């Protein structure tokens, strides 16, 4: 902005000085015309003098352009007396040229306003040249925008009369700018051609992967078929940083019986080796299947008819279900505490079933779903019959309980997989379920000394308020229990009983004190006494 302001000031000073000199010359011209006849205004050879006048105008414009460029180049320095003298000399030369133009205007009355128009045109040329200088300085810094700036300069020059005697100035500037930038004149079409070349090169590589004469015939037929089908092949798939050989993929799959057979028999490893692809590629089977379905399966159905889309979908669904069965639960229960028995270290678990002893409160059973949570808040949901819901915290409790379940269920699974009659399998299943319940109860009681346990049970019976059960361990063989029902809190202690019989129970008694609406009671119970109302039973089936 400062540079532009200085330029405008300089232009105004030069114009004022030129105007003064022109007025002085005009007075002298008027005095000389008073002594000579006015026949000069209509010369017989006017056409011959018109051409030199046009050349004078062009020279004047060129001189003005040179003066403006010199002024723009010296703006960063302080104006010196010598520079001012040069500017005055340039101004005088421009004044003489302007005087010639004025004389021509005086001789021809058809163009009375030519002088003012010439000054306006010169002002416009000066401003445009100043902008051109700024753009030329940025040539090397604006390589990509070179074409746009050049087009803008040509557009400006086309709106005004030619100011240079050499009309090839702009093409020369463009060529120089192109050499500086190191880019051709048509940069964007060059990029587009490069993209087309890459696209064609991929097809060329696909055609030239080997010398099989059937390759070209197959690829031509495939591409024409996909084009007619409305799904043209717009790009060649890339796998392992190389072009995927669609021809060999089609040959290998059809030799195996088609895509459905390859999926059902899991033959993708052989096809991967046949394509000379690295065996270390992750999900190579999925990638090959999806690429085959996209580019080759419609062609297979049309030409060979080895399968149909319904069979393909069924094969994919079956493969997905098998994958889920194989990966279910195998790695979820591998954690085993150091102090756990060796029978609890089996990592296999394929059937989830867990039932714990229920707590009967005034004849009403509390039932819900059970969720076991680790400290990382990763839930493991286990299917539970209508029994007590338990929420445990801690790695040891979770691992021990799940490991005990896994050990019992592993034995159950091995027996069920042995070819025994269904009736015997059902009987064994019931027996193993009972054994599992007893093992879980035993392990829960054995672990109370290692890990504090807080069990809260919520249930809502019909016509009753929420009930809650809190269990807290006090030692190795006792559990403090607190039950809140209809606003009344019942507390007691449950003692462990050796599992000598299947129907053995752990009994505790509590004395009820308090009032309805939030009363609390505290009781001390001993193992032998008979239970009193309310009772808390933990039967094992």
Curated annotation (Swiss-Prot):
Keywords: Cytoplasm, Developmental protein, DNA-binding, Nucleus, Transcription, Transcription regulation. Residues 55-73 have a biased composition (Low complexity). GO terms for cellular component: cytoplasm; nucleus. One of its GO terms (biological process) is regulation of transcription by RNA polymerase II. Residues 497-504 are annotated as: Important for cytoplasmic localization. Residues 452-473 are annotated as: Homodimerization. Residues 408-450 are annotated as: Important for nuclear localization. Residues 407-501 form the REKLES domain. It comes from the Eukaryota. Residues 17-172, 499-541 are annotated as: Disordered. The keyword Cytoplasm applies. The keyword rRNA-binding does not apply. Residues 103-112 have a biased composition (Basic and acidic residues). Transcription factor required for smad1 and smad2-mediated responses to TGFbeta during mesoderm induction. This is AT-rich interactive domain-containing protein 3A.
């Amino acid at each position: 902005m400062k540079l532009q302001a200085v330029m405008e000031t300089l232009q105004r000073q030069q114009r004022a000085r030129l105007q003064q000199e022109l007025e002085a010359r005009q007075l002298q011209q008027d005095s000389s015309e008073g002594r000579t006849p006015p026949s000069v205004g209509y010369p017989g050879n006017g056409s011959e003098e018109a051409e030199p006048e046009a050349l004078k105008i062009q020279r004047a414009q060129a001189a003005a352009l040179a003066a403006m460029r010199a002024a723009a180049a010296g703006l960063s320095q302080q104006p010196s007396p010598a520079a001012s003298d040069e500017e005055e000399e340039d101004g005088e030369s421009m004044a003489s040229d302007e005087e010639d133009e004025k004389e021509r205007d005086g001789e021809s009355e058809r163009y009375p306003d030519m002088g003012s128009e010439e000054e306006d045109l010169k002002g416009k040329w000066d401003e445009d040249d100043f902008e051109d200088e700024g753009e030329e300085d940025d040539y090397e810094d604006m390589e990509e925008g070179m074409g746009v700036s050049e087009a803008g300069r040509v557009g400006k020059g086309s709106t005004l009369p030619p100011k240079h005697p050499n009309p090839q100035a702009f093409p020369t500037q463009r060529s120089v700018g192109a050499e500086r930038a190191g880019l051709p004149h048509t940069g964007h079409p060059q990029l587009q051609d490069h993209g087309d070349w890459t696209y064609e090169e991929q097809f060329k590589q696909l055609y030239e992967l080997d010398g099989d004469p059937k390759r070209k015939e197959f690829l031509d037929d495939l591409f024409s078929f996909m084009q007619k089908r409305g799904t043209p092949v717009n790009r060649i798939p890339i796998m392992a940083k190389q072009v995927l050989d669609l021809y060999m993929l089609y040959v290998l799959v059809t030799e195996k019986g088609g895509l459905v057979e390859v999926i059902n028999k899991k033959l993708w490893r052989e096809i991967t080796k046949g394509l000379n692809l690295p065996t270390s590629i992750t999900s190579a089977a999925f990638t090959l299947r999806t690429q085959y379905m996209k580019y080759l399966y419609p062609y297979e159905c049309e030409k060979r008819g080895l399968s149909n889309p319904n069979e393909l979908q069924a094969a994919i669904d079956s493969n997905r279900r098998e994958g889920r069965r194989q990966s279910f639960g195998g790695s979820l229960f591998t954690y085993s505490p150091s102090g756990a028995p060796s029978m609890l270290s089996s990592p296999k678990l394929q059937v989830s079933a867990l039932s714990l002893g229920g707590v009967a409160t005034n004849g009403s059973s509390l039932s819900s779903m059970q969720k076991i949570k680790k400290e990382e808040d990763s839930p493991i949901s286990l299917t539970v019959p209508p029994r007590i819901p338990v929420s445990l915290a801690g790695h040891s409790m979770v691992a021990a309980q799940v490991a005990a379940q896994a050990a019992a269920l592993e034995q159950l699974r091995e027996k069920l997989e042995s070819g025994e009659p269904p009736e015997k399998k059902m009987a064994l299943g019931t027996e193993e379920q009972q054994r599992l319940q007893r093992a879980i109860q035993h392990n829960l009681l054995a672990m109370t000394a290692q890990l504090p346990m807080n069990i809260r049970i919520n249930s809502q019976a019909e016509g009753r308020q929420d009930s809650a059960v809190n269990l807290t361990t006090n030692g190795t063989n006792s559990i403090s229990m607190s039950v809140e029902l209809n606003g009344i809190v019942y507390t007691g202690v449950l003692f462990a009983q050796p599992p000598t019989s299947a129907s053995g129970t752990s009994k505790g008694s509590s004395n009820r004190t308090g009032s309805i609406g939030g009363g609390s009671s505290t009781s001390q119970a001993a193992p032998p006494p008979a239970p009193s109302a309310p009772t808390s039973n933990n039967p094992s089936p």
